[in-house]
Amino acid sequence: MWTVVLGLATLFVAYYIHWINKWRDSKFNGVLPPGTMGLPLIGETIQLSRPSDSLDVHPFIQKKVERYGPIFKTCLAGRPVVVSADAEFNNYIMLQEGRAVEMWYLDTLSKFFGLDTEWLKALGLIHKYIRSITLNHFGAEALRERFLPFIEASSMEALHSWSTQPSVEVKNASALMVFRTSVNKMFGEDAKKLSGNIPGKFTKLLGGFLSLPLNFPGTTYHKCLKDMKEIQKKLREVVDDRLANVGPDVEDFLGQALKDKESEKFISEEFIIQLLFSISFASFESISTTLTLILKLLDEHPEVVKELEAEHEAIRKARADPDGPITWEEYKSMTFTLQVINETLRLGSVTPALLRKTVKDLQVKGYIIPEGWTIMLVTASRHRDPKVYKDPHIFNPWRWKDLDSITIQKNFMPFGGGLRHCAGAEYSKVYLCTFLHILCTKYRWTKLGGGTIARAHILSFEDGLHVKFTPKE
């Protein structure tokens, strides 16, 4: 036992010395942004991981901005990081992508999503491919031509099931709903083989991405790796079964990836599993969180519910068959619904920051950011700018009527920006609009409890959101 303890102590001391020397031996000339690096190894990770009960920018970032200004340095999960809440700086960094900076995830998340393998050696080529295959199956054309009816059917089935229950915890229930829709699109009939609480495991992974990469029993990182391996095992079984019994000719997401494997050198079976893992996660987590926040905010603002219901009833009554399916033209006409979604995304900022990494020393605004440092662009701060949004802390969907497209483009970034605008943005909006149309025309809902915000590096709900759904007469 003492041998183990002494060994761990030696390891810690060695890492501490390495960490200190790393800063002392930095070979660059220039001025770093102001700030503090915190403790060895953990930096200031604990402060950012501490939940806040507000939708506002996290208190850790607010306090740092008040003390050091909108650009400051820190250390998160063992990585040196420059954090920026400066709009001009953030725009400049996004324009530098492919030149001075590249897309980046902190080491923990990179491990979870397989980005410490061959992916990073061909990041530009891989991103182009992932964007292409995602748009092919989840983009506007696919939604308009094929996918919208499946989203509508999934929403109707879920709401009918929820209406038979005395109470529904919306975050978990909606995560399962969206996950099933997404994997059915990705795997077709093989989606039935993905049993178990995979959405729950994915949510745990997201919650643990700021954890220190210490892989031994009891650590958050170890638990997340275990969940990751269990999910990947199920995905590998689906891929192997498809190859053994069907082949690559099925026209779903998996089928296209297997077919592309024959012509693209960087695509291997392991790459496909990591791709399926990443897209499965990305396709549901943000939608379910946004949907939960929408219902929380609607419960607090009945005047918004009234106008929302009026818009959807008008769409329904204008049909030849009021109970007929939603059309693409109807979706595009849901103006106020999209304003509600935009306002929720502005306040909620489900993903409140973007991460990049410098590939060379970068000089900007009088500072130097050394090669290899992470840059955290706090896009959520722009969503609270009173110069752009009057009374920015108030939920007001009507504000979007007066905002022009250029102002929105520069100051509203819920789906990323620059070269990395989310390929699934339209899918998210279509899903939310479709769900709200069915909800507003066929159901009433009552909040029973929960809804407490827990904002850390992600948005979550401390006690869920418990709702009773009742069919309209």
Swiss-Prot record:
Hydroxylase involved in the biosynthesis of cucurbitacin and mogroside tetracyclic triterpene natural products (e.g. siamenoside I and mogrosides IV, V and VI). Cucurbitacins have cytotoxic properties and exhibit deterrent taste as a defense barrier against herbivores. Mogrosides are nonsugar highly oxygenated compounds used as high-intensity zero-calorie sweeteners; they also possess pharmacological properties such as regulating immunity, lowering blood sugar and lipid levels, protecting the liver, and acting as antioxidants and antitumor agents. It is found in: Membrane. Its EC number is 1.14.14.71, 1.14.14.-. C.sativus and L.esculentum expressing S.grosvenorii genes SgSQE1, SgCS, SgEPH2, SgP450, SgUGT269-1 and SgUGT289-3 accumulate siamenoside I and mogrosides III and V, thus providing a strategy for vegetable flavor improvement or for heterologous biosynthesis of mogrosides. The keyword Heme applies. InterPro entries: Cyt_P450, Cyt_P450_CS, Cyt_P450_E_grp-I, Cyt_P450_sf. It catalyses: cucurbitadienol + 2 reduced [NADPH--hemoprotein reductase] + 2 O2 = 11-oxocucurbitadienol + 2 oxidized [NADPH--hemoprotein reductase] + 3 H2O + 2 H(+); cucurbitadienol + reduced [NADPH--hemoprotein reductase] + O2 = 11-hydroxycucurbitadienol + oxidized [NADPH--hemoprotein reductase] + H2O + H(+); 11-hydroxycucurbitadienol + reduced [NADPH--hemoprotein reductase] + O2 = 11-oxocucurbitadienol + oxidized [NADPH--hemoprotein reductase] + 2 H2O + H(+); (24R)-24,25-dihydroxycucurbitadienol + reduced [NADPH--hemoprotein reductase] + O2 = mogrol + oxidized [NADPH--hemoprotein reductase] + H2O + H(+). The lineage of its organism: Eukaryota, Viridiplantae, Streptophyta, Embryophyta, Tracheophyta. The chain crosses the membrane at residues 4-24. It comes from the Eukaryota. Highly expressed in young fruits 15 days after anthesis (15-DAA). Also observed in roots. This is Cucurbitadienol 11-hydroxylase. GO terms for cellular component: membrane. Heme binds at residue 422. Pathway: Secondary metabolite biosynthesis; terpenoid biosynthesis. Its cofactor is heme. The keyword Metal-binding applies. Keywords: Heme, Iron, Membrane, Metal-binding, Monooxygenase, Oxidoreductase, Transmembrane, Transmembrane helix. It is a single-pass membrane protein. The gene is CYP87D18. Mogrosides, the major active constituents of S.grosvenorii fruits, are a mixture of cucurbitane-type triterpenoid glycosides that have been proven to be powerful and zero-caloric sweeteners and can hence be used as a sucrose substitute for diabetic and obese patients. One of its GO terms (biological process) is brassinosteroid homeostasis. It comes from Siraitia grosvenorii. Its main location: membrane. It holds the Pfam family p450. SUPFAM superfamilies: Cytochrome P450 (SSF48264). Belongs to the cytochrome P450 family. GO terms for molecular function: heme binding; iron ion binding; oxidoreductase activity, acting on paired donors, with incorporation or reduction of molecular oxygen, reduced flavin or flavoprotein as one donor, and incorporation of one atom of oxygen.
